[in-house]
A protein has these predicted regions:
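Residues at the starts of beta-strands that form the adenosine-phosphate
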Residues: 2, 24-26, 81, 106, ...
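Local beta-strand N-terminus motif with an aromatic residue
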Residues: 24, 55-59, 129
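C-terminal helix-rich "cap/oligomerization" subdomain common to oxidoreductases
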Residues: 19, 28, 40, 56-63, ...
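Contiguous beta-strand/loop segments that form the cofactor/metal-binding neighborhood of enzyme cores
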Residues: 162, 166-256, 263-270
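Beta-loop-alpha module in the N-terminal Rossmann-like domain of NAD(P)-dependent dehydrogenases
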Residues: 14, 36-99, 118
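N-terminal Rossmann-like dinucleotide-binding module
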Residues: 1-37, 286
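Predominantly a Rossmann-like dinucleotide-binding segment in NAD(P)-dependent oxidoreductases
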Residues: 116-184, 189-198
Length: 293
């Protein structure tokens, strides 16, 4: 089996995951300093078409948000499954269009947290308590302020597109009634200006750039409260807080094993149409929650 990874930021993680699954990996990135197998997607796909019979088992779209639709569309004819990094594409309609135009390809919005090894335990706790808080709060970690990350026309949004999809996917794992749930609160708010931000390990500030996206996002859905924040002034808080009885689980960064579980599970279910209908419903639901914030 062989896969293609487009974009070698988070894409390097997928390269490692795929190699762990004994899958050959073709990497593509425009930046030659990242040492990709190819710097041109079209050439890489042509090379595969000429040298290998059969389609790639998976493709992984790990490029900037505004390129997701185009890259996914380009690689779909060559791949059995296409994984698109969060936040997916601009709208739910765009996602549905990708699916409809490529009936022989399966699409997955990356929801790696749903494949954590302990997700069963977390779901059990969530169902037993009166309220649950899901928090992904960073202490001053705005990604590359002034870059495409913080330009709404390119990123489609800020923390609502960066971190909130993770929390929404966890919520769906916990609440069996997510399909019919209606948020009682859904807000995205920008509290800072570019000149107020500082360079961190998440990137340097481009003082000539744009910062017109949300940096705080909140949802309330049934007994669940979700908070995503790029710039808290006190501390990091990436956890799930269960009430009555009190129990707190520290999320931290998602383990690589969860990504491996996700990819492997999708491959194993390649012919399971119920599985893919469930994925489509989940992916459309996440898109619909964040597209109008």
């Amino acid at each position: 089996m062989k896969s293609i990874v487009v974009g070698l930021g988070i894409g390097n993680l997928y390269k490692s995951v795929l190699e762990n699954l004994n899958i050959d990996v073709l990497t593509v990135d425009k930046d030659s300093d990242k040492k990709p197998d190819s710097t041109n997607l079209g050439s890489a796909l042509l090379q595969h078409e000429l040298s290998v019979s059969g389609r790639l088992i998976t493709g992984h779209v790990c490029t900037p948000n505004f390129t997701h639709y185009g890259v996914a569309h380009d690689i779909a004819p060559y791949c059995k499954i296409v994984f698109v990094e969060k936040p997916g594409v601009r709208t739910a309609n765009d996602w549905q269009r990708l699916v409809d135009q490529n009936p022989d390809t399966k699409f997955v919005l990356v929801k790696n947290n749903m494949w954590r090894d302990n997700i069963g335990e977390l779901c059990k706790h969530a169902k037993q308590v009166e309220s649950v808080e899901l928090n992904w709060i960073n202490k001053d970690r705005v990604p590359s302020p002034g870059s495409w990350f913080t330009t709404k026309e390119l990123a489609f949004g800020g923390v609502s597109r960066d971190l909130m999809p993770h929390l929404l996917s966890l919520y769906m794992a916990f609440d069996d009634n997510w399909r019919t749930a209606e948020p009682t609160q859904a807000l995205a708010h920008r509290r800072y200006d570019l000149q107020e931000l500082s360079s961190t390990d998440y990137g340097e500030v481009n003082t000539n750039g744009v910062y017109n996206v949300d940096d705080l996002c909140k949802f309330s859905i049934n007994k669940y409260k979700l908070t995503a924040d790029w710039r808290d002034t006190q501390s990091d808080k990436r956890n799930i807080i269960f009430s009555n009885p009190d129990y707190k689980f520290e999320l931290g960064l998602c383990p690589e094993q969860a990504y491996e579980n996700m990819v492997n599970d999708c491959i194993q279910n390649i012919d399971n149409e119920d599985f893919w209908q469930d994925q489509l419903e989940k992916d459309l639901w996440i898109h619909k929650q964040i597209e109008n914030l």
